[in-house]
């Protein structure tokens, strides 16, 4: 049975040019990968609500072992989403505002 609804063309290159931005695509993919676990998203949200927090305080917010939180923090730090400053035997974490602004801009441009 054929549909009487007209379907739009599948891909018309003249309709809208494709804006190829490989560097931005790579950065967005890296940031999304870093946020690819719900606990990491929660850590970033928690840090956005605070100015800075020690790793132990962050670990208290999640139902996982401190060592697991440490791994999540490393992923976020490696992607540049958070920064950690050593304070004696502890590390104090804060959100990298520039990286979050970049993430928001890149997601908004999708």
List the predicted regions and their residue ranges.
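N-terminal leader segment of winged-helix/HTH proteins
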Residues: 1-35, 81, 92, 101-102, ...
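N-terminal helix-turn-helix DNA-binding core of bacterial DNA-binding proteins
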Residues: 22, 26-65, 91-98
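A cross-family signal for key residues in well-ordered alpha-helices
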Residues: 42-45, 77, 104
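Base-recognition residues in the alpha-helical recognition helix of bacterial helix-turn-helix
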Residues: 45, 71-74, 89
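Alpha-helical residues within the helix-turn-helix
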Residues: 60, 77-78
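Alpha-helical linker/hinge and terminal dimerization helices associated
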Residues: 62, 106-110
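Beta-hairpin "wing" of winged helix-turn-helix
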Residues: 78-87, 94
